[in-house]
Amino acid sequence: MEDFVRQCFNPMIVELAEKAMKEYGEDLKIETNKFAAICTHLEVCFMYSDFHFINEQGESIVVELDDPNALLKHRFEIIEGRDRTMAWTVVNSICNTTGAEKPKFLPDLYDYKENRFIEIGVTRREVHIYYLEKANKIKSENTHIHIFSFTGEEMATKADYTLDEESRARIKTRLFTIRQEMANRGLWDSFRQSERGEETIEERFEITGTMRRLADQSLPPNFSCLENFRAYVDGFEPNGCIEGKLSQMSKEVNAKIEPFLKTTPRPIKLPDGPPCFQRSKFLLMDALKLSIEDPSHEGEGIPLYDAIKCMRTFFGWKEPYIVKPHERGINSNYLLSWKQVLAELQDIENEEKIPRTKNMKKTSQLKWALGENMAPEKVDFDNCRDISDLKQYDSDEPELRSLSSWIQNEFNKACELTDSIWIELDEIGEDVAPIEYIASMRRNYFTAEVSHCRATEYIMKGVYINTALLNASCAAMDDFQLIPMISKCRTKEGRRKTNLYGFIIKGRSHLRNDTDVVNFVSMEFSLTDPRLEPHKWEKYCVLEIGDMLLRSAIGQMSRPMFLYVRTNGTSKIKMKWGMEMRRCLLQSLQQIESMIEAESSVKEKDMTKEFFENKSETWPIGESPKGVEEGSIGKVCRTLLAKSVFNSLYASPQLEGFSAESRKLLLVVQALRDNLEPGTFDLGGLYEAIEECLINDPWVLLNASWFNSFLTHALR
């Protein structure tokens, strides 16, 4: 490209471009496309000015170079191509002698006939996009903009093209020639793709014809034309008095602005009532795994084979019995369902060849547990039109529940490290493009911090269960299929490990719509005695099914093994999102990355290495009643990941509403902390909107409690 530039352009232009690049500290050996762009822009500016003069009568005339009248006054003053100091001297001189307004940015030319500065643009993109970028950067009515493209298009302020058609045609022909020459040498594609936009884009262009008529018709009441409305909008001072803005609005808007002070906000009111209960689709901190290391059995990787192999590792099975009944369920059916699973697994083991999948016998206990024949009969609406008292059945309001300590314990546990590795390096995704070294480094550091995290185990468990359940729902719609709940990991030594958490039995699953529900019964192993926190296990029937020998510092001890059984349901859309729980890794990585970027911009260098390797530095993790909690960067990574995972596990309309409404209050509080003197109206309405989302969801209640801690410490 450098050779092409030196051959293609006048040596004077090349020299000016070299000086300009040197002035801005750019290396023309590296930035060859920029070198070509500067030369092109300089040549267009010179061609724009060439042959244009002003005669004694003040008229613009075009005169060829060898004309004796060439001593006439030049129409254009060339500013582009001068060093910055000299260029500003020329601009100041023009402003002083002509009374023109001083521009914020150095323009390219001054037109003595029209008495205006001109900004010349040469773009490899679409002219209107580049024009908008230029207009928004300059933000001046007094600088005229004229854009040329390499395809022969042009655009100018108010469609005023300044020059005669022949002069503009010369410029377009020259640009087209440059493009052809570059293309012949295989340089054009690289040059075209290398153009960077101006800083910002603001669409401020003339609207004409049909669009103009539509714009005039679409105005709010009391505005006669688009110009009036624009003037009104421009008159809205962004930091002006809110009351003034409100007074300009419709008479129906009646809002009194109250100053928001440190004493203004009150805590969010959490509901009273019985403690909230566990509602996740699978057990979290209370789950127990039956595991096999370095699996190499026949059929390894087939879920049913893996499950049977894991079940064989436990020898403490005993006659199951109910230790915590479900208050409203037929608990004997849950007990019989587990016995049926054990019996049918035993039958499989007695067969010569283990099948790849297992469909359970449709016994009365499973039919009850899976809600078979329980759905009300659907009747076509047209057949009901004549029924006078036809109405939707009454549904009870959900019972209010209070915050319980178990959900905070669940979250704390999700942030902890386990002794297994749950994701490989490529779980977040390999580099698709030759991405910069820094991005890969950040990903590797982040993966190292979260690969052992319990929240990561929940991701892999959720992905597996949802994938298996969705597959079975589509492949075996009428069957009560037995689905093992499995995960895979590596030990610290790198040995592979397969884990069995329990089983799911899927009900009938003719899922036509995304929201159609498939019922399932989950049966999950645990060492947690449900009688310690019975309120947490309201939806479960818990059986004692065996005794497990555990090694501890004082020797072996026996602990009862429980089975948590419940009826549950999910839908195609929920399973689809459950299968994509790995997104949580990406979301939390991006949050960490924005922290690194903020730090790097302060230090003016990439801080990734220091960020992760400076073990002595602590970072804010969150608020608690004790104040701002701080921890290592690894703890921050794991906490952000756990929050993202819990948002997925406990997704609900209550969470959506609380997040959206509490964010508004958060922004006002942050504005107060930044001394921006915020004002509010209808703060009571905002609190009402937040508090109507606090019903019974444990994760939402915990977030509301955290928000109250934040309010307390933020407003001290």
Curated annotation (Swiss-Prot):
Motif Nuclear localization signal 2 (NLS2): chain residues: 184-247
The organism's taxonomic lineage, starting at the top: Viruses, Riboviria, Orthornavirae, Negarnaviricota, Polyploviricotina
Record PTM: Phosphorylated on serines and threonines by host kinases, including human casein kinase II.
One Pfam family from the record: Flu_PA
UniProt cofactor note: Binds 2 manganese ions per subunit.
GO CC terms of this entry: host cell cytoplasm; host cell nucleus
Protein source organism: Influenza A virus (strain A/Memphis/110/1976 H3N2)
Protein name: Polymerase acidic protein
Job of this protein: Plays an essential role in viral RNA transcription and replication by forming the heterotrimeric polymerase complex together with PB1 and PB2 subunits. The complex transcribes viral mRNAs by using a unique mechanism called cap-snatching. It consists in the hijacking and cleavage of host capped pre-mRNAs. These short capped RNAs are then used as primers for viral mRNAs. The PB2 subunit is responsible for the binding of the 5' cap of cellular pre-mRNAs which are subsequently cleaved after 10-13 nucleotides by the PA subunit that carries the endonuclease activity.
Similarity remark: Belongs to the influenza viruses PA family.
